[in-house]
Amino acid sequence: MLGKIPRRRFVGDAVAVSLGSLVPRLVGAATGGTRRMTVLADEEIGTVRPEFHGHFAEHLGSCVYGGLWVGKNSPVPNISGYRRQAVEYLKELGIPVLRWPGGCYADDYHWRDGIGPAESRPKRVNIHWGGYVEDGSFGTHEFIGLCRLIGAEPYLAGNVGSGSPQEMRDWIEYCNMPSGSTLADERIKNGATEPFRVRYWGVGNETWGCGGWMRPEVYADHYRQFSVYLRKYGGTERFLIASGPNGNDTRWSRKFMDTLEGGKPEGISMHYYEGGEDHPLHFTEEHLKKQLAVFSRVEDAIVQQRSLFDSYREGRQIALVLDEWGVWDRIAEEDEKKFGKLWQQSTMRSAAAAGLGLNIFNRQADKLYMCNIAQIVNVLQSLLLTDGPEGKQSIRTTTYHAFALFKAHRGNSAVKVETDSAISDREKPSLDLSVSASTKNGLVLLSLVNPLPDEDLEIQCALRGTTAKNARALLLHDPDWNASNSFDAPDRVVPKPHPVRVEGSTVRLDLPRMSVATVTLTP
């Protein structure tokens, strides 16, 4: 999670690449409000890993305390301390992987503060996010319990900035050693007879910023030292994720790789945010177009970073993990006072941004391993919002519903799409139709985003390498890009059935302005 680094830097330092690798193959110029495309069902890109739909929870504002965790004695309906309605919504969506405890918070978090009897845990100041005191009641056991409740695989971010190799090594043993060692027996004494079997371990977070302000050469040395001691226990595989660049900072990545030599990680992270110049509910058309167009350049970053790592022999086996991404709007002071730091409403514009990102991940399925949007509840581009720490209401945001529309892609084979939409001006990025497709057992799933605030589109989609007789579509749409789901109107923006027709080998539908759609095609 970004600390004091200006968030606009996250989209800087890009280098020029061929547009052909970044956008769907072109089949001619876009005309008026019509967009033509061809799904190439026999040209596979890669598997749409469920982990592309990962999430992130940090001790920040009311994400954990008051959002996910209310405590067992809370008047808020709960399941052993976890907010019941939030758990039910997250289970319904399916959360493949959840990253915790940060973010910036991770590099000041000492895991032993969060184990043992809750009343005996030390109270610590959260130095990164407001200086408030946390009671430590949500720690490792509570996080693993949440993951098990919602069906998520845990991803733990270790402390490099203020921690030590010994501390992180012990955390892994505590979590994964079945029994027999002092640390494993301590876990058992604390109520967990079975090991937690945590595979994913982040070795620091944003080490170029809030994780220690390190030069890439310095962090590479730290990573090499840590990796010597971070072993696997009890048959649980170890997947270490190194802290990666600030946005698309290719210079940082190259210096890290040049210094790394031994100690190759299984994965390397990158973070990508695009800021907003307006309050989430009061975006102008000009700023909307600018934000979404620049945000779409995450595709450049993915392609360029993957290419850079592949240029190193040892880098070809390092997975690319986009473990923080999303839109970061101008936060309203009144919202933070009422609901917590970085509390951000999600609008139809936010849903379009989510759809743009998820389409990009499908199109670049051969280059990515995991993606985690920031964050899961109450903070930035979240899935859920709650009405204050003691409030009993949880609502699903427009971003939640965008993720729901893409859920059926998980595990499918992403395939290529030819389209007549194009981003033509690299210096002044523009918006147009965004599309991706996947297939499985004869089914074709087509996802489309119309991020244009002022133009409805007619879609004409041909199929190659497959046929379809039946089609159904779901549409998430509101002509007002500032529309949101509120506590008074929690279902204002929700997916609804949408007309679609198959005419011979062509699929046709109308795609209104500011909308996200998924079309399911079957033989």
Range-by-range predicted roles:
Residues Y273-K290:
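Active-site His/acidic residue clusters
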Residues K289-Q291, Q345-S346:
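Extracellular loop and loop/strand-boundary signature of outer-membrane beta-barrel proteins
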Residues L2, P6, V11-W252, D258-G267, ...:
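Non-catalytic accessory regions flanking glycosidase/transglycosidase catalytic cores in CAZymes
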Residues M270:
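Flexible glycine/proline-rich, aromatic-decorated loop/lid segments
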